[in-house]
Amino acid sequence: MTLEKGNIIKRIKKNERDEFSNTVANSELTYKVIRVNTKTYGLECIGGYMKGTKCNLIKGFKEKSADVYGTVTEWILV
C-alpha cells in the first residue's frame, strides 16, 4: 500500500484469546498521514486511545501481520 499526505488509515488489532479481551490487543486506531519521507510516513493519531500522538511508519510495512501471541494487526485505507 502506498500512502500520500492527507490519507486516513486505520490500524486494527484483534486477538481472540480470553486473556487479551480487555487490552490494546483488541483496539482500533485512526491515523492521518501528515508527512511522506523517502523511508517513512509521518502519522498523527486522530482517533482511539492514542489520539493526539504522532509516530512514524516505515514505507515497507506489512498490511497484515500476526505476532507470537496471536494478535493480528491490519492496516486499511479509509
Model-derived regions, located:
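Short coil-to-beta transition motif at edge beta-strands of beta-rich domains
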Residues: T2-T23
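Assembly/interface hotspot detector across virion components, adhesins/toxins, and nucleic-acid enzymes
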Residues: I12, V33, F61-S65
